[in-house]
Each structure stands twice: as structure tokens, then as C-alpha cells.
A protein has these predicted regions:
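Active-site environment of divalent metal-dependent phosphoester hydrolases
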Residues: 10-25, 38-42, 157-158
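Short hydrophobic/aromatic-enriched beta-strand-loop microsegments
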Residues: 30-34
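Active-site-proximal segments of metal-dependent phosphoesterases and phosphodiesterases across multiple
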Residues: 1-13, 118-119
Length: 394
């Protein structure tokens, strides 16, 4: 941006999740950023120079903590607005913001974990399982079982702490977006992918998400193993279907078969960006149940009558569906989420056999390019030597 518009004096970065403890100076332009999730406020003081440009005098990030006393007038306004949340929004879904959905004793992974740890995480497990539960237990369920549900890290905004899980907390955990209905929250969408494309979903997580961490994928129904040391786009060594929570046996994926996939609208729209990142090598086309490509993903929103099934509402329903194990009339989050279930297994091996087993077409393409480059280098060396000999002989 600075290169395109050098006359800008100050760029306040947003949506990058980057905390800059000191401004970045690029020519006469300063770039600042407070970080993410409202954890800091930033203050900056600048003095104008004789040439019209500006110098930074002071710059400080101020952590937002409970120790900061709220402004009374502002807090009063916020409280009045919060009172409308129940009547103007949550009433559409039969909830109130302070309603307790479940009691939680599980230590769930954090949002930061989703970006920093490339493995199965229980926060992703419970969210993806919630998608399956909400669809298959809706009064509008059409009887078509969900084979796979997918949740990317890029949509998750908060975790679930120990104690009471309220509607407000669940909404905050998945608060992004808006649907075609004009109501806040991304809806769930229903689509179909071939078995070959399901394997590519696993490969996107294994190969692409280290460069594009919003594409870390957490699946219900799709289990896979990957080796981070293998060639890019050929890191997945095993991929198969398994019912949520391990019910039933392993099911091998048929490349040409259509599988029912549920995800949120954001994820569907994100596929284009992922394919661009892979330069078209990873191509996934969402389809209807007859195998026809879907032109508008918004039209695939899962509807309950005239209302979209929102992703956050799916999670809320799942939370309150758990058994009441302590008899106090409130659901308890299942102990199932206290451990991993081989949904995403990391095979951290440098063994030569592990590095080359199960090659796919991408490894063949990349290997072919590598060999071609080596051949061209050899030919270039031979050509240079030949030219040098001719020069010496002359």
C-alpha cells in the first residue's frame, strides 16, 4: 500500500492479527498495529515537519484489562444495547444471551493453538461434531446423512473455558459473517465432493495451512495421517472416513463417489483463495447431490423453514444436547473431548520409506519439474564449457 500511495502519513493495520510494539517506518510513512481481538489500544502522537510530512513523537500499546475503569456513560449505552440482543436477534433462535447451555470441565485448546499447532485439537473436534449433530437432528432433516463436516481455524474466534457455557460465549466463538437472510452469523451450507476431493481437503490442511494458517481444517468424519517432512502436496499418507466419535468402522474413500459435506459459508468461499495459493494444483468444486457444480454457495444454506441454520446455533444445540451427568438439570460437556481420536495424526518421520511411500500425481509432477531443472542445469554447464573451449582454442 505504501509503495502504491507514498503520500500516506500513517497506516493503521487491521485484520492482520499483528502486534507491533514499535512503528514500522517506510520512507515518510509509519505503520502501526495493536494486535488482535481488542486486547490492546494504541496511542500515537505525531508532529508535522516543515515539508508537511510527520514524525512520530510517542507510540504506546495499552493492554485492555479489567483494571481499567469503564466510562460510565459509555457502559450505560452498552448495557442498553445489550438488552436488545435478546429481543432483536437471539429471539429468532429461541435463546437468550445469558442462557446456560452446558457445564464444562474440559480444557479446550485455544484459538492461538489452532494457528500454532498443526494437529488434532478438541476445539475443532467439538465444533465439527456440532455441525453433524445440528443437521441430522433438525426437525427439517431430509434424511441424507452427513459424511464429513469441516471447520477451518479462520472462522473460530474464541474457545470454551471451564465452567458454565452460555449462549453469549458460543456466539462469540463463531461470530463471523452474515447470511443471505441478513442476520448476523454464517449459515451452514450443504454440498457434495468426490472422494478424490475429500483427500484434497486433507492435503490442503497438511500442505497449505502452514503457509495459510486460516486453512487449518478440523473435520468430523474424515480422518487422516500426514508427515510434515514429505514433499509438499504429498504429505498425507492415509485418509479415510469414520463416523463422528468413532462410531462404526473405518471406511475407505472411493475417488469417484459423491460424499455429503457440511461446512459454513465462509469455508466454502475460502476454497477459491486456497486454490489460488496452490496455483490451481488443488482443485475442489462443490456440487449438488446430482454432481452438478454449484454456482452460488449462498443458495446452499441449510434452511429450517424460512430461516438459515447458523453455525453458532448448531454449536449451541450440540452443547445443550449432552447428558446431564451430575443431575443438576444442566448438560455436561462430554468427556469424549478430553482426549484425541486420530482425526489428524502427525507422522513425524525422516525414514526414507516413510518419505516416499504412497506417491500421488503431485509428487510425480514436482519430481518431474525437479528432474527437468537438473537436466537444464547440466545442459547449461555443458554449453558453457563448450563455449569456453572454443574461446581458448581461438
Amino acid at each position: 500500500m505504501r509503495k502504491m500511495m507514498p503520500d500516506i502519513d500513517l497506516i493503521i493495520s487491521g485484520h492482520t492479527h499483528t502486534q507491533l510494539d514499535e512503528p514500522i517506518q517506510h520512507g515518510d510513512t509509519y505503520i502501526v498495529s495493536c494486535g488482535e481481538y481488542g486486547r490492546n489500544l494504541g496511542t500515537i502522537s505525531m508532529t508535522q515537519k516543515d515539508d508537511g510530512r510527520w514524525d512520530v513523537d510517542t507510540y504506546e500499546l495499552i493492554p485492555v484489562t479489567d483494571e481499567i475503569k469503564a466510562d460510565a456513560a459509555t457502559q450505560e449505552r452498552i448495557d442498553k444495547l445489550m438488552g436488545t440482543v435478546d429481543t432483536n436477534y437471539l429471539s429468532h433462535f429461541g435463546y437468550t444471551k445469558d442462557q446456560i447451555l452446558a457445564e464444562n470441565d474440559i480444557e479446550f485448546s485455544s484459538v492461538d493453538d489452532m494457528y500454532n499447532e498443526h494437529e488434532e485439537l478438541n476445539l475443532g473436534d467439538i465444533m465439527s461434531d456440532a455441525y453433524v449433530y445440528a443437521v441430522e437432528n433438525s426437525e427439517y432433516y431430509d434424511g441424507d446423512p452427513v459424511d464429513v463436516a469441516v471447520v477451518p481455524s479462520g472462522t473460530v474466534r474464541d474457545t470454551y473455558t471451564k465452567g458454565d457455557v452460555t449462549v453469549e460465549q458460543v456466539y462469540n466463538s463463531f461470530s463471523l459473517g452474515i447470511g443471505k437472510d441478513g442476520l448476523a452469523g454464517y449459515p451452514l451450507i450443504s454440498a457434495y465432493l468426490t472422494g478424490k476431493e475429500l483427500k484434497l481437503v486433507a492435503e490442503i490442511d497438511a500442505s497449505v495451512s502452514d503457509f495459510m494458517t486460516i486453512a487449518r481444517l478440523y473435520c468430523s468424519g474424515l480422518n487422516f495421517t500426514y508427515n510434515p517432512h514429505r514433499m509438499i502436496l504429498n504429505k498425507v499418507t492415509d485418509c479415510y472416513l469414520m463416523k463422528a466419535q468413532g462410531e462404526g468402522n473405518r471406511e475407505e474413500i472411493e475417488d469417484d463417489k459423491l460424499y455429503h459435506v457440511v461446512t459454513d459459508l465462509y469455508t466454502g468461499q475460502m476454497l477459491g483463495a486456497v486454490m489460488d495459493t496452490s496455483y490451481g494444483l488443488l482443485s475442489i468444486t462443490p456440487k449438488d447431490k446430482d454432481g452438478n457444480p454449484i454456482e452460488n454457495l449462498e443458495d446452499q444454506a441449510i434452511m429450517e423453514g424460512n430461516q438459515e441454520l447458523k453455525a453458532w446455533a448448531a454449536i449451541a444445540r450440540y452443547m445443550e444436547s449432552f447428558d446431564d451427568t451430575d443431575g443438576d438439570g444442566i448438560a455436561n460437556v462430554s468427556e469424549y473431548y478430553n482426549e484425541k481420536h486420530d482425526r489428524k495424526v502427525v507422522e513425524d518421520s525422516w525414514n526414507i520409506i516413510d518419505l516416499v511411500k504412497h506417491p500421488n500425481k503431485f509428487s510425480a509432477i514436482i519430481a518431474g519439474i525437479f528432474v527437468l531443472v537438473i537436466v537444464l542445469i547440466i545442459l547449461l554447464i555443458l554449453l558453457v564449457r563448450r563455449i569456453v573451449r572454443k574461446i581458448k582454442n581461438n
